[in-house]
Regions:
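Charged, alpha-helix-forming regions
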Residues: 1-322
């Protein structure tokens, strides 16, 4: 009787419908998905400097006696979390890998492969067992609206606080896996509080007419669209550039699309071919944004801002407004 009820509930999952996509824009989310963090049963504590006066302490650890598919948090995992949060914001309190795949691509009619579903499920099952605690007491005591009002403030949850339901139909053996939402993830509650959630019209993610939605293409286009949203919203940015690679002297680290999506440039032919492929996806994504009216225009820029085609393309300048 219990299995029958589960089957009926799963079979009646509502149709996914959303007008916006949401992306975590906090420094914490970037550090988690780009820095080597060993996940084990003890705390891995990160000191994340928001500015010269604010330091947040972030603890990350996994459940005991659990073997993860990977012992790190990847840009793909962050994209899965963003997609899950987008679904939650649409009012749904149950998730499926199929839904997340459609949100990731931005194409609700996309044909989802078994390989992609399995990759998303592995990511979800990993994120369900990783804890995060964000001690933002220092930040809250610096903010004008909460200064000297709160002595201690922490957010804590799993990276994706989800239950799991598995149902197999007797008639055809089809397996359905769904994930009921237990609570909003701490990383996103924190982002909401400090107004670091980027939102974009959902149709901007639909680029299937420009190129095929491989896992790599999805991560690249989401990076580009998020960066454009940051530029257009004037989120305290002094640059209108989408850069492949630049050095942040204040943070003493490499920034840009390459390091933030896990690419390691070298002098091999393989990397030169890969770089051309990445550039093509970036350029076609920007063309799609221009065609949809999200930006006015864009142009490539080269090393030292020269127009000489002998110098490598370093990224693109974005132009928007009237």
């Amino acid at each position: 009787m219990k299995n029958k009820k589960v089957n009926e509930n799963t079979e009646k999952l509502p149709v996914l419908n959303f007008n916006k996509q949401y992306m975590n824009n906090t420094k914490i989310s970037r550090i988690l998905s780009t820095k080597p963090i060993l996940l084990d049963e003890t705390y891995a504590q990160l000191r994340i400097e928001i500015n010269d006066k604010i330091i947040n302490l972030v603890d990350v650890w996994r459940d005991e006696n659990i073997t993860l598919s990977r012992d790190d948090i990847t840009p793909f995992d962050l994209a899965v979390m963003d997609a899950a949060y987008t679904i939650m914001c649409s009012g749904k309190m149950i998730l499926t890998a199929e839904w997340i795949a459609k949100v990731l691509s931005g194409n609700p009619k996309q044909k989802i492969t078994k390989k992609k579903i399995e990759a998303i499920r592995q990511s979800i099952d990993k994120l369900r067992y990783i804890h995060i605690q964000i001690d933002c007491s220092n930040e809250f005591n610096y903010r004008k609206d909460t200064k000297n009002k709160i002595s201690d403030f922490k957010y804590e949850s799993y990276l994706l606080p989800l239950d799991k339901i598995t149902a197999v139909y007797q008639s055809n053996g089809k397996e359905i896996i769904a994930y009921p939402v237990l609570s909003k993830p701490a990383l996103y509650r924190y982002a909401e509080t400090i107004h670091q959630i980027v939102d974009v019209p959902a149709d901007l993610l639909d680029t299937h007419e420009e190129y095929r939605d491989t896992d790599e293409a999805i991560l690249i286009k989401r990076y580009v669209i998020k960066r454009v949203a940051q530029i257009v919203s004037n989120n305290k940015l002094n640059s209108n550039k989408i850069s492949f690679l630049w050095y942040d002297r204040e943070e003493n680290e490499e920034r840009g699309l390459f390091p933030e999506l896990g690419y390691i440039p070298d002098n091999t032919r393989s990397w030169r071919n890969k770089k051309q492929k990445i550039n093509k996806i970036v350029k076609m994504t920007l063309k799609s944004l221009k065609d949809k009216g999200a930006i006015k225009s864009f142009e490539e820029y080269r090393e030292n801002d020269t127009k000489n085609p002998a110098f490598p393309i370093m990224g693109y300048k974005i132009f928007y407004g009237l």
